[in-house]
Amino acid sequence: MTVEIFPCNDKSITKTLVFSSGLGGHANFWQPQIDFFTQHFQVLCYDQQGVQQDSELLSSNYQLKDLATELVDILKCNNLSSCHFVGHALGAFIGLEVAAQAPQLLEKLVLLNPWDELDFYTLKCFNLRQSLLEHTGIGAYVKAQAIFLYPPQWISENAQILTEQENQAIVKFAPIPNVLARLNSLKAYQPKTTAATVNHPTLVISNADDTLVPWQRGLSLTQNMPHAKFNLMATGGHASTVTQAAMMNQTILKFLI
């Protein structure tokens, strides 16, 4: 497992900001955030268990709570407490579970494109991706991903870099049983009950043009949390930290400081 800690540019600042990725699980998802947020915080990013090409197989009953326990262990091993947290989709739910399991470890939460319960539309998207992986192969699974993550115009304008990233992802693809175990754990997770118990100040951000998660699900999650605010962005797609990085960074920072 890879854990990366980037010191704050201001050495007097020790507050840590933790970033947790979505279904892909890789730390490099947050590359557009590193330089900006290390002006204000120490930043921790990590590869989630099972996402490397040479990863051991995950257990057959792998659950979202296992991902939360993994992050708790990372924070404790690095002597970190009272961190701010930013999580994307699956990563957002890791934050919810950590806030429930070990509330003292987190201070403020930012949840990007989460849901209160799995929408039928999102389930159809997940089932389609699973079918591609099981019946067509790794290449089709990886190359379809952009359709769910990014707006059409962004895909058109970034064809070369996107193709390069896809080719690298195919070569470095995780064991297929791990990808399916992680997807099934996300499909099975019910965040609504846990969210209602989380008392941390929370910002939920959804995107109106998200082609994977209807933004109304983010609003519903916000309404189920005692201390949450909701921000709806007009554009950016599901991965707006990539496509609208500057706007997202400013929105997140304004909430955290």
Enumerate the predicted regions with their spans.
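Conserved HGGG/HGGXW glycine-rich cap/lid loop of the alpha/beta-hydrolase fold
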Residues: 5-57
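Active-site loop/oxyanion-hole signature of alpha/beta-hydrolase fold enzymes
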Residues: 44-86
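Gly/Ala-rich beta-loop-alpha elbow adjacent to hydrolase catalytic centers
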Residues: 87-91, 95
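Flexible "cap/lid" loop of the alpha/beta hydrolase fold
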Residues: 100, 107-136
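Conserved alpha/beta-hydrolase catalytic His-Asp/Glu region
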Residues: 120-122, 140-194
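Short beta-strand/loop motif that positions the catalytic acidic residue
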Residues: 198, 204-206, 210
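Conserved alpha/beta-hydrolase "acid-adjacent" motif
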Residues: 211-217
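Catalytic histidine-centered segment of alpha/beta-hydrolase-like enzymes
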Residues: 236-245, 249
